[in-house]
């Protein structure tokens, strides 16, 4: 799962808190929490069994993280979570336009959204242009993720949160 930590090589921003939306088995949140022990992670998933697993992993590894049984849409309605994170990350969760709706409401203005994607990211970003503008995001860069020994075309799309997300999202 080197693709989860590869964004660290490209100038990872100094942040205090991050949320991994749709964490599933803990990717990318668990590898990032291992590599960045000073950052507070929240791992979020809609399935209770996955969250139980995440809590076990967090406890056994002694990570600076919590796991929440929560959908992103519901998290955005909670005042303590809405625009409460410096960074929101996701890997293999949804197309970019939908992912923006899940992640950007959770990111503080001045923070970032990080989407771990495949070779179609440029097309996805073009299709998400309206969503980005509406939700307060702006594409900062697309970072190729080089995985030693693998011929994969993985990319990290960095979205800067430049304005508050309207309350209806």
Where on the chain are the PLM-derived regions?
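Conserved alpha-helix/loop element of class I SAM-dependent methyltransferases that forms part
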Residues: 1-15
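Conserved SAM-binding loop of SAM-dependent methyltransferases across substrates and taxa
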Residues: 25-38
